[in-house]
């Protein structure tokens, strides 16, 4: 049997081969769940009479020094900012009520939310006590689209804990985080390859 023609394999790269008819990989579906005004919201759940009062959680309210760690929605209406000195917050809103932090209570609520997230995926990355990234790519066949999963999580969180979530849904962590910041409180924002320029390009640089 005569040998066949010689072939040049000098440029052969096995990693560049594609299966015939194969489709490009699909985007992952990443959620970023952010518990709204977490510390202040927990305090108002434990003390319902505070719900409609401007409240800020801080380090040492007795000595009236330190900074604002968290504030509720009524306090936000007065322009209270996280991280600002208590004296500045008091000047903006003389009626504001400063509360001490209760870390054990915050941890308990945070764990409740983690258990809720695990109903939908085990691909969870904590981003602080009140924020998580969830990769729900493998859960879409069971629970629907990323938006549907985010909305179900928000509804379940409110029903079981009283807390609200702002959720961002996107194809990477950066955009999902920006999605959860885009609309608050208690909202879902989808940032896709089709709309990310429309939603994000007009934002101020400090929001990026």
Task: Outline where the language-model segments fall.
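Gly/Gly-Pro- and Ser/Thr-rich, intrinsically disordered tail segments characteristic of DNA damage-repair
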Residues: 1-208
